[in-house]
C-alpha cells in the first residue's frame, strides 16, 4: 500500500537524519518557554473543558457502536466493512483515551514518567494516522462494492493483512512523535509531559515531522475523499440501480461530513507549520502559535466524535442492529435467519 511504503521510507529517513542531527549539541536553540500569559492559560483551560465535554460523548457512543458491531459481525458475518469499522472505532477510542491522559497530565491531576509520556504520544499519533487511513480504505471498499455490485473479498486473511499493514505503517509514522518528549519532573521521575526542543537542527527536524503529519493527516485524506466524492457523484449513480440511491446518498453524506471537518483541519495545520517556520520567539508569536496548536489538537477529537455518529447512527441498518442489541436479539438464531441484509450494507 502507498501509506506503508511511504511510512517506511519516511521512518528510515528520520532515523538517519536524527543520528546526524543529534550528534552535535553545540548550537543551542533559543525558544521562549516563559511566556505564559493569562490568555494562554485561559486557552489551555478552555481546551481541557472542550476535551472533557467531547470525551463524555465519544467514549460511551464508541463503546456502544463497537459492542453492537462486534456481536453483529460475530453472528452474521454479512459485510466485509464491519471489521474495518470495528478497528476504526477502536482506534478512535484509543485516541480519545490518550487525549484524556494528556489532559489530566496537563492539569496536574496525574503524573507520568518518560516512558509513559512517550507511549501515550506514540498511541496518540498512531491512532490518528490509522483512523484517517482506514476511512480511505472503507471508502475504497464501498466504491468497489457498488461498482461491481458484488463482494468478492470476504477472505478473513485478506482483512487481517490489510489491517496489519495499516497498523504497522501507522506505527512507523508515529515513531518521530516521541523524539521530543521530556518530563517536567515533580514527584521523582514523574511529572508533566512536555515537548522540548534543544537545538536549531532539532527544531528544523521538528518542522519536517510536522510537514509529514500535515501530509498524512491533512493533504492525503482530503485529496482521497474529494476524489471519491466526485466519483460517487458522477460515476456510481450511472452504474448502480435505483434501489441503491439511499446507499449513495449515505456515502455522499459520510464523505461530505468528513471534508467539512478535514478542510479546516488542513488549513489549521498549514497555519501551524507557518508559525513554526517563521520561528517568532516574541511573546505575541508564542501566544499565536500556542492558540493555533490548541485548535489543531482539537480537530482530531471532532473526527472521533463524528465517526460513530455519522457512520453508525445515521444509517438505518445500524439503528436496527442497535435496537436488536438493546433487546438482546442479536444472538437469536431465528432472527438471524430472517434477516439477510444486502452485501453492500453495513
Curated annotation (Swiss-Prot):
The keyword Membrane applies. Keywords: G-protein coupled receptor, Host cell membrane, Host membrane, Membrane, Receptor, Transducer, Transmembrane, Transmembrane helix. One of its GO terms (cellular component) is membrane. One of its GO terms (molecular function) is C-C chemokine binding. Residues 57-83, 143-159, 230-245, 311-346 are cytoplasmic. The chain crosses the membrane at residues 32-56, 84-108, 116-142, 160-181, 209-229, 246-272, 287-310. Residues 1-31, 109-115, 182-208, 273-286 are extracellular. InterPro entries: CCR1-9-like, GPCR_Rhodpsn, GPCR_Rhodpsn_7TM. It comes from the Viruses. One of its GO terms (biological process) is immune response. It is a multi-pass membrane protein. It is found in: Host cell membrane. Coiled coil: none annotated. The keyword Transmembrane helix applies. Its main location: host cell. Belongs to the G-protein coupled receptor 1 family. This is G-protein coupled receptor homolog U12. It comes from Human herpesvirus 7 (strain JI) (HHV-7). The lineage of its organism: Viruses, Duplodnaviria, Heunggongvirae, Peploviricota, Herviviricetes.
Amino acid at each position: 500500500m502507498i501509506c506503508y511504503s511511504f511510512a517506511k521510507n519516511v521512518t528510515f529517513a528520520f532515523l538517519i537524519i536524527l543520528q546526524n542531527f543529534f550528534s552535535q549539541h553545540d548550537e543551542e536553540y533559543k525558544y521562549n518557554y516563559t511566556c505564559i500569559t493569562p490568555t494562554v492559560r485561559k486557552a489551555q483551560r478552555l481546551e481541557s473543558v472542550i476535551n472533557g465535554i467531547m470525551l463524555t460523548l465519544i467514549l460511551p457512543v464508541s463503546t456502544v457502536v463497537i459492542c453492537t458491531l462486534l456481536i453483529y459481525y460475530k453472528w452474521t458475518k454479512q459485510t466485509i466493512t464491519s471489521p474495518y469499522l470495528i478497528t476504526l472505532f477502536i482506534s478512535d477510542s484509543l485516541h480519545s483515551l490518550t487525549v484524556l491522559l494528556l489532559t489530566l497530565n496537563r492539569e496536574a491531576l496525574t503524573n507520568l514518567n518518560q516512558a509513559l509520556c512517550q507511549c501515550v504520544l506514540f498511541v496518540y499519533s498512531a491512532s490518528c494516522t490509522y483512523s484517517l487511513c482506514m476511512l480511505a480504505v472503507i471508502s475504497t471498499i464501498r466504491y468497489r462494492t457498488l461498482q461491481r455490485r458484488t463482494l468478492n473479498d470476504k477472505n478473513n486473511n485478506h482483512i487481517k493483512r490489510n489491517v496489519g499493514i495499516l497498523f504497522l505503517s501507522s506505527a512507523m509514522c508515529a515513531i518521530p512523535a516521541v523524539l521530543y518528549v521530556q518530563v517536567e519532573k515533580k514527584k521523582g521521575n514523574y511529572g508533566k509531559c512536555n515537548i522540548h526542543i534543544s537545538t536549531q537542527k532539532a527544531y528544523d527536524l521538528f518542522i519536517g515531522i510536522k510537514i509529514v503529519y500535515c501530509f498524512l493527516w491533512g493533504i492525503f485524506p482530503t485529496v482521497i475523499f474529494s476524489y471519491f466524492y466526485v466519483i460517487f457523484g458522477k460515476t456510481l449513480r450511472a452504474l448502480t440501480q435505483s434501489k441503491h440511491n439511499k446507499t449513495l446518498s449515505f456515502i455522499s453524506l459520510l464523505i461530505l461530513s468528513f471534508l467539512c471537518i478535514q478542510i479546516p483541519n488542513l488549513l489549521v495545520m498549514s497555519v501551524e507549520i507557518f508559525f513554526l517556520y517563521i520561528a517568532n520567539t516574541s511573546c505575541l508569536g508564542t501566544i499565536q502559535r500556542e492558540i493555533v496548536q490548541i485548535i489543531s489538537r482539537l480537530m482530531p477529537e471532532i473526527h472521533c466524535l463524528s465517526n460513530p455518529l455519522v457512520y453508525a447512527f445515521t444509517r438505518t441498518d445500524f439503528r436496527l442492529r442497535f435496537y436488536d442489541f438493546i433487546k438482546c436479539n442479536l444472538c437469536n438464531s431465528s432472527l438471524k435467519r430472517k434477516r439477510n441484509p444486502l452485501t453492500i450494507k453495513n
